[in-house]
Amino acid sequence: MQNISINIEKKEFFNYENKIKTHIAIKNFNLEIAKGEFCSIIGPSGCGKTTLLNLIAGLDKTYTGSISFGKNKAVHNLNKAFMFQTPRLLPWLNVQQNVEVVLNKNQNKNEISKKFLSIMGLEKFLDYYPNKLSGGMQRRVALARSFATQPQLLILDEPFTSLDEPVANLLRKMLLELWAKQPTTIIFVTHDINEAIYLSDKIVFLSKPPSKVLKEININTKRPRKMDNNTIQKIKNKILEANNSILEGEL
C-alpha cells in the first residue's frame, strides 16, 4: 500500500426534501498520510472530524474530490478496522467470540483471537461476557479485535475518551505495543493534544468549519518512546507558542 491521498473539494449536507444546502462541512481539504504512519487529527468541536472519517472509510460517498491510495485505488477498498468512542462489543458473545466474529472462515480463529487477547493481557478472560468487564477491559477487547483482522488502515475515533487517566495511559501504551508488533497506517481522532504528542508521527490540526488542514506538525521523538509528562508538556508548549489559537481552529 502506498500513501493515502485525501483531496476533498467539498462535502456539504442537504435537506433532501427541498434540496436546500444546509451546511458545508469540509472544503479544500488536502492531506497525505504515509504508509505505516500514525497520524492524529485534532480540531475544534463540530469541525467535521467524524464526517471526515466516514468519507475516508467509504461510509459516505457524497462529496466532490478523491480519497485514494497509490495511483488508482479507492481507500474504501482497503482492509480497514475501526475503533470508536465506545467499545461496541456484542453483549451475547464472550471476549474470545467478540474477536473471532470479525475473522473469516479461512483463518485460524482460535489461534488469532488468543494471540491478540494475550497481548492485551486478557488470556484469563476469554469466556467472560462484556457486562462482566470494566470499561478499560472492554476497550482492550476492542483493540485486540481491531488488530486481529490485520488491517491496512486502522481508524480510531477518540477511543479512550471518558476513561480515567491511568487506564487511558495503559491503553495508549498497549496500542503502541500492538502497532509495533503489527505495523499499519493509523488515523486517530482526538481532542487531547497530549495524547496526540505521545502517540503520533504526525499531528494534523483542522480549521473551524468548513474544515480544512490548518497545519501539520511532525513529532520526531524516536520510538519506542519514553515520554514523561514534562517532555510532552515541553513539546505542547512549543506547538502552542507558535500557534496560539490552533486548538480553536485558527492560526
What are these model-derived regions, one by one?
Residues 154-157:
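Catalytic Walker B motif of ABC-type/P-loop ATPase nucleotide-binding domains
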Residues 57:
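Helix-to-loop junction immediately C-terminal to a conserved catalytic motif
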Residues 42-44:
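The feature captures the beta-strand-to-loop junction immediately N-terminal to the Walker
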Residues 143:
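Hydrophobic anchor residue at the start of the ABC signature
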Residues 108-120:
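ABC nucleotide-binding domain "signature" region
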Residues 64-76:
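Conserved ABC transporter NBD signature motif
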Residues 128-131, 149:
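Conserved signature/switch motifs of ABC ATPase nucleotide-binding domains
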